[in-house]
Amino acid sequence: MKGEHLGEFEEFTLLAVRALGDRTYAVPVQRYVEEATGRPTSMGAIYAALARLEDKGFVQSSMGEATAQRGGKPKRLFRVTPVGLKTARELHRVRERIWTAIAEGRRS
């Protein structure tokens, strides 16, 4: 694994893959991120984030079956790894602690 820290966009992408389930591919991930964030998202940004997540060990990819509608080209399918799931859950816990502290007026 190259690194364990995630940027905001990588986090959104990781969560989208998790929400869409195993064996999702880039197009639904892009649509999910756009809908969830309300921001336009390019396919290039999605592909780059998925590549970084795979380099870090947070997602795994495999090639799906070739389909006629894709001109015989297979889709690259993604799934969240156990390490990716653990990281996503930890990020969620950190955000909850911070928001709880804010709500309670604590500074640290």
Predicted regions located by residue number:
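Amphipathic alpha-helical dimerization/coiled-coil segments
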Residues: V83-S108
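Conserved beta-strand segments that form the floor/walls of ligand-binding pockets within enzyme
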Residues: R79
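N-terminal helix-turn-helix DNA-binding core of bacterial DNA-binding proteins
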Residues: G3-A45
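Beta-hairpin "wing" of winged helix-turn-helix
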Residues: K56-G71
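Short beta-strand/turn micro-motifs at beta-sheet edges
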Residues: M1-E4, E65-T67
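Basic amphipathic alpha-helical segments that dock to polyanions
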Residues: I46-L53
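Alpha-helical residues within the helix-turn-helix
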Residues: R31, E54-D55
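Exposed loop/turn and edge beta-strand positions of beta-sandwich/beta-sheet ligand-binding modules
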Residues: P74
